[in-house]
Amino acid sequence: METAPTRAPPPPPPPLLLLVLYCSLVPAAASPLLLFANRRDVRLVDAGGVKLESTIVASGLEDAAAVDFQFSKGAVYWTDVSEEAIKQTYLNQTGAAAQNIVISGLVSPDGLACDWVGKKLYWTDSETNRIEVANLNGTSRKVLFWQDLDQPRAIALDPAHGYMYWTDWGEAPRIERAGMDGSTRKIIVDSDIYWPNGLTIDLEEQKLYWADAKLSFIHRANLDGSFRQKVVEGSLTHPFALTLSGDTLYWTDWQTRSIHACNKWTGEQRKEILSALYSPMDIQVLSQERQPPFHTPCEEDNGGCSHLCLLSPREPFYSCACPTGVQLQDNGKTCKTGAEEVLLLARRTDLRRISLDTPDFTDIVLQVGDIRHAIAIDYDPLEGYVYWTDDEVRAIRRAYLDGSGAQTLVNTEINDPDGIAVDWVARNLYWTDTGTDRIEVTRLNGTSRKILVSEDLDEPRAIVLHPVMGLMYWTDWGENPKIECANLDGRDRHVLVNTSLGWPNGLALDLQEGKLYWGDAKTDKIEVINIDGTKRKTLLEDKLPHIFGFTLLGDFIYWTDWQRRSIERVHKVKASRDVIIDQLPDLMGLKAVNVAKVVGTNPCADGNGGCSHLCFFTPRATKCGCPIGLELLSDMKTCIIPEAFLVFTSRATIHRISLETNNNDVAIPLTGVKEASALDFDVSNNHIYWTDVSLKTISRAFMNGSSVEHVIEFGLDYPEGMAVDWMGKNLYWADTGTNRIEVARLDGQFRQVLVWRDLDNPRSLALDPTKGYIYWTEWGGKPRIVRAFMDGTNCMTLVDKVGRANDLTIDYADQRLYWTDLDTNMIESSNMLGQERMVIADDLPYPFGLTQYSDYIYWTDWNLHSIERADKTSGRNRTLIQGHLDFVMDILVFHSSRQDGLNDCVHSNGQCGQLCLAIPGGHRCGCASHYTLDPSSRNCSPPSTFLLFSQKFAISRMIPDDQLSPDLVLPLHGLRNVKAINYDPLDKFIYWVDGRQNIKRAKDDGTQPSMLTSPSQSLSPDRQPHDLSIDIYSRTLFWTCEATNTINVHRLDGDAMGVVLRGDRDKPRAIAVNAERGYMYFTNMQDHAAKIERASLDGTEREVLFTTGLIRPVALVVDNALGKLFWVDADLKRIESCDLSGANRLTLEDANIVQPVGLTVLGRHLYWIDRQQQMIERVEKTTGDKRTRVQGRVTHLTGIHAVEEVSLEEFSAHPCARDNGGCSHICIAKGDGTPRCSCPVHLVLLQNLLTCGEPPTCSPDQFACTTGEIDCIPGAWRCDGFPECADQSDEEGCPVCSASQFPCARGQCVDLRLRCDGEADCQDRSDEANCDAVCLPNQFRCTSGQCVLIKQQCDSFPDCADGSDELMCEINKPPSDDIPAHSSAIGPVIGIILSLFVMGGVYFVCQRVMCQRYTGASGPFPHEYVGGAPHVPLNFIAPGGSQHGPFPGIPCSKSVMSSMSLVGGRGSVPLYDRNHVTGASSSSSSSTKATLYPPILNPPPSPATDPSLYNVDVFYSSGIPATARPYRPYVIRGMAPPTTPCSTDVCDSDYSTSRWKSSKYYLDLNSDSDPYPPPPTPHSQYLSAEDSCPPSPGTERSYCHLFPPPPSPCTDSS
């Protein structure tokens, strides 16, 4: 059957036409008007019209399914399953637009019915499995049925008798009846029923009609299901909806896409009303007779009901009802003001509330936007706010219960907010952050933020409060899982439980009983303990695969389960268990609350306890707290902003202490600090800077701990000293490990090495920007204090008779230096020239850190564990500031007076392009190391000639003969096991191969990082780059691959071009491109035979330069100017050179080379690196003389590359520099200065000699010539010793004969059994030479002289060409008791063999002598091909439509065949749509709506799965215009449950080359598979690898990059 043409929908009719149609209904019409849904629109058609054309009522719809009307108002209602909405329009209003009636809580509203008397809408939802009712405007919505429903569909009303009817096509198909108020539910039809789709009531005859799409009938029965009769049977294809008028039934059919009619009594008089519809769905007769008016008890005063008045079949024939979740008061008329006990639920992208007052547990979505990944949720019963955390938005937000008033409270310095808790008494909000590993608090409005706990937290999760007792409890699921307790101010912290815990996710307090409950997602238990830590016991441990959210209200504990996708509850005493919600994905936290009940109080409830900011009730007293940056006054209630304060480092923390009051030590909430050492600040930006000698970084943050960032993170070893130049906005530091003093801008830019010579263990730094001096101490063999200009020049020793001077500080007012001496245990001072030395304090146990402010000096003492102060001139009035401190490294006073003054750099950076460096009386402009300053413009130019060398985790730059700057580590992120490096001098990109088998690139300042190749992006995941080289002219990168043993080429923009060289035995490794001459040189590490080869850049013209004197050549470099090739052999430990042609081989160096791994040429020198000796050395490249060590003590060396400037003239002169020489792929410079275009091996050059295209479509038994006039030759001619291709490519790269083949003298290989068979098979007849030799002992000699194995004799198969091995077999056969069967087959066998030989000879003569050789001009292939490769597209069709046929002019040659499609011809459509295949598993919240079904009973009534539809043209899938989404996302019964969050710990190795292995799946939802269970967090910090999949609901839709979602909970990725 051909597909009926789909007509474009007509334009909407003029409003006047609808008015005329509607008004025509007022008088009795001769034929009814049919209202039907057509997916994309709702239409009207006159069933008795002449033209039978439909009129559009509503257009531009997504997926209109069910439809009904209210005749008295002219209103039309319909459901849209794509928009998940119920909508309305009017027939009698000009230009009426569609209105939304119900837009939330719907998933698949399949059925719709209008109660025209009670003015209600009823509908079914086959996904939520509910039947609901609401007023016609959508208000007072109520769920009537939610249990024992399984795919409800059609619904019909009989308001006169108070009944509703519906069909259910689930596991137990049936038709049910109930009162319209939800009472007297009864099954009336449950036999001989399969897919009951359509349903309608004959109000006049009191009959019920329904259509069954599977059994293909229309039946009727009495309204109680009795007296069932057939109306139409057997001849229906796929009836969907039906209605009636008078004696006529009307129905829609999915397969015919038509509306049909018949007599309702007999089923006869069938006719087609309207055909060629887009997709006819529900249908109604738009007539007054279908909605007769009558009086009901609800007419007057809504029956006395406050909300819903629903008709009923029982006296008084109506019932009052309340909206979902609200209880009816005892008077039976009035509803309560709202739900009292509510379960608040956080899902991934929405919040929901579930009333616990009513048994339906319907979840209602809060209308709050921009929820991306909600985690935890809580509620404030006083103000009615819902609070939640969102770890994708990185914020804490709140809104009212109805979704209004949404606010963002906290969205700065918050990484992964997890648990949340409301202190409804003190009006504070607590939360845990598993990213920053903190517990913090604010006021409920988001102000007065303070960190309470920041130490010894690993993965804090749930948090609950006990305001009455002043305690808080939280869980930590880190390496040492535990449940802890502390006061509400974070003090008096102690561990409550730390044994037999895995992932304690949920936590709940029973305030009345004094008990603490928790759920563990790893041990799969719910446990309880007294709040004092006693009497621990297990409440539940059955079928708890992965608890996450957890809460308690009254007698019940509620929890969410990630794997079961359910919300359940258990009685806390009886342990009885119920399921609240089942099969709802993306479940996170939940909170059960009584929305109006406030429990408990404390002194903070009265005037905030007298506190100005935060009030904390604790078990001992009420305490006031201050937000970050404020200090508490001596009244212990008021917080102020301090004028000055002390800041000090103490290993992993940085603290601030008030100078005014004691006991005010506050840890600055900084993340990622390991071992802070030096400390300074920038008062103008309120920044604090510190060095970390463990992380080897310099970092900064605001004084409140926010915006932590690394300023310097490369090339540091032990940065012990640091100082901020607050005028020039520069940062200075001293590195004891590298023996350098460096400077950079405050953001880390323009880094310059200032001093690196004659430094011996530099330590503390101090700056005097006003005077232009820098001061530092040295701890080397001769300790001293040194001064220099701030540009690093004019160094001089100020103090030389000193011990280990530490923490140098300056009194800017009195112009004096202060320092601590660790050897003499004194604090000393001098003037700024090192003179007038005086001891300020002596006999100190161990003074270390030092600072000065006003009239005092402040110092730390490691032995006393204290901070003290004293008079700065006399050392008197010593005062203890703080005790009980360990290892305070540095100390300073944060105050503006410490950073005052002016110099030239304050204004416009001194007009300098990069660095403005103060010097006495002025300033000097400076540049980043290796950059050159232009004195006139004061701008800096990057270096053009330099060396790059790589280590395992770093790439450095150096200029060998530059005495002004040493080598510098480049700020390149993510370097891991760097193997090879290269550089593009045009675009200034560094390229490297890393340990993850990627080729990456970035600018030398670390910007614009990108990846050229990776296992996940490449065509083959088995790629392992070894070496790389760049052709700067054609903008391509060549690289060798260890895994595939190929040479590949990429464009520098990242596009892969393909393979240029591969061979069966090739193992190319080191590579060097000589683009100026069009060649590449490479080492070929074949088994036991290393070679150095040369080839053209397209892999052709291969030439072996050297095969001897090589063992393991590891690196190559080309010097084009000198015309030399250099290489180093790691096993022979020598460096050699030769001409580019391979001549004049010369050994340059072979002494004291231990482990060479790379070499390069720069200027007059040849450089190499030696990994074992940790050195970079060089010699003169022509003679090998003047060997010099360039750099020493460089560990883990891996590569070296020289960069020289390429002039514009030199570049422009290259033939490939302009537009790649016009080539589409590879451009090669020829000797005459012109370009030659070529292609990778999988493509061929087309006739225009510029463009590469697919190879010619030679048949599988043919060989494709690379270039030339001839495209295809028979495969047998390949490697036969006679070149047939014009370019002789058929004789290139011929394989070595296998063990079962005989090698002919001219290279041809023939079957070994054809050797000495009496007939020449080699072209040179060498297989028949020397055939008189004696056969081996285990061989049989044929009559022809051929030798075959003895075991092949008499095996019933002729192995000798003359068949002599099968002769005389019966004579030589051992005696047997069996009677031999008579056979006379020997003669015919010999005849057949001889015939075959004759035919073969004829064929050979025909092919070789008589037949004209094929040339491209006479072939059927497109002659635009000039070259080719032996690959044939699967669906090639020769030009002219011919798919096969002999070569023209060659009648005796083979035909050229191409593969043909098995699917069908053009325009065919698939039998099903994979996107909507029945039973397809999806993990999306919007589409995962299945439940775990028992074994299959019925396939769903869908065109996609109905066998009767497989041979038709219309399928309801997104593949054809019929629909963009199936009307019903059918789910096959018995399929697996929807996918769950990826539940494996994925550990990504830095250097692994293996692919991901397939996952295993849960067979039992009640057990975890240790040790690889799903981690209990949406964002695990342990998963940092770029290819890893975070095991959380956050990955439920994507399952990490391109991998498909698993069809069930996964437990292992091993």
From Swiss-Prot:
PROSITE patterns: LDLRA_1, LDLRA_2, LDLRB. Residues 1257-1295, 1296-1332, 1334-1370 form the LDL-receptor class A domain. Residues 31-287 are annotated as: Beta-propeller 1. This is Low-density lipoprotein receptor-related protein 5. It is found in: Membrane; Endoplasmic reticulum. A motif (PPPSP motif C) lies at residues 1573-1580. Residues 1007-1021 have a biased composition (Polar residues). Acts as a coreceptor with members of the frizzled family of seven-transmembrane spanning receptors to transduce signal by Wnt proteins. Activates the canonical Wnt signaling pathway that controls cell fate determination and self-renewal during embryonic development and adult tissue regeneration. In particular, may play an important role in the development of the posterior patterning of the epiblast during gastrulation. During bone development, regulates osteoblast proliferation and differentiation thus determining bone mass. It comes from Mus musculus (Mouse). The chain crosses the membrane at residues 1384-1406. Residues 944-1211 are annotated as: Beta-propeller 4. Homodimer; disulfide-linked. Forms phosphorylated oligomer aggregates on Wnt-signaling. Component of a WNT-signaling complex that contains a WNT protein, a FZD protein and LRP5 or LRP6. Interacts with FZD8; the interaction is formed on WNT-binding and signaling. Interacts (via the phosphorylated PPPSP motif domains) with AXIN1; the interaction prevents inhibition of beta-catenin phosphorylation and signaling and is enhanced in the presence of GSK3B and WNT1 or WNT3A. SUPFAM superfamilies: EGF/Laminin, LDL receptor-like module, YWTD domain.
